[in-house]
Amino acid sequence: MDTKIEIMRENPLFLSNFTPKYAKMNATTTYHTPVLLSESVDLLAIDPDGTYVDLTFGGGGHSRYILSKLSERGRLYSFDQDPDAKANCPDDPRFHFVESNFRFLRGALRYRGVEQVDGILADLGVSSHHFDCTERGFSFRGEAPLDMRMYYRNGRSAADIVNEADAETLTRIFGEWGEIDTPYKAANCIVRARATAPILTTAQLVEAVAPCTPRKDESKFLTKLFQALRIEVNGEMEALKMALEQSLKMLRP
């Protein structure tokens, strides 16, 4: 199964044709150090000869720690759909990098001859690396294309959603994924702003929702707004549900 969705648009209004500089960056130094590293990995009760999966490779912190506990017969399969993560892969014959969204867990491992595994780890959320790479559009600080895709050719960008979705859909996104108190206000602000000009950058989005942004909690409000869009763009909740269902079928008793 081809796990890369190649959806390209010709309309210059949207950003699906945008190929960012970050695709060729070496991002090793900008990933955060995993929190509770030993505590989380130790809960896997590593069998040195076992087969393990890291669903969120990122900077490779968890994967390297798991590798340190494996024997020569042990195996680790680490997933990440972000091309930047490939720069962090260890040179280790026990390590296998899977450039894919973890929603394809079972199919990707079966393709590699793996039917069952001894443990699966996921460090969910977004890495500090994504905020540090301002050109990716994950942060509301500064000016950047409104993209937010973990894989830069993977379906719709945040700009596509902001400019295409109706007020009802935007309200659902901001309420469900961002838990914003008044999501309909943010949705209406966006609909009004884009009627004048398309919203293509992070700064333009911040400006569009300025009329409904609480001054005392501006940072918190924008954090929730951007989080909601990121989750929608990348289908994070659907991917997690699929991965959990597949994990139950792949874990050894």
Walk through the language-model features, giving the residues of each.
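S-adenosyl-L-methionine-dependent methyltransferase catalytic core, i.e., the SAM/SAH-binding region
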Residues: 6, 14, 18-253
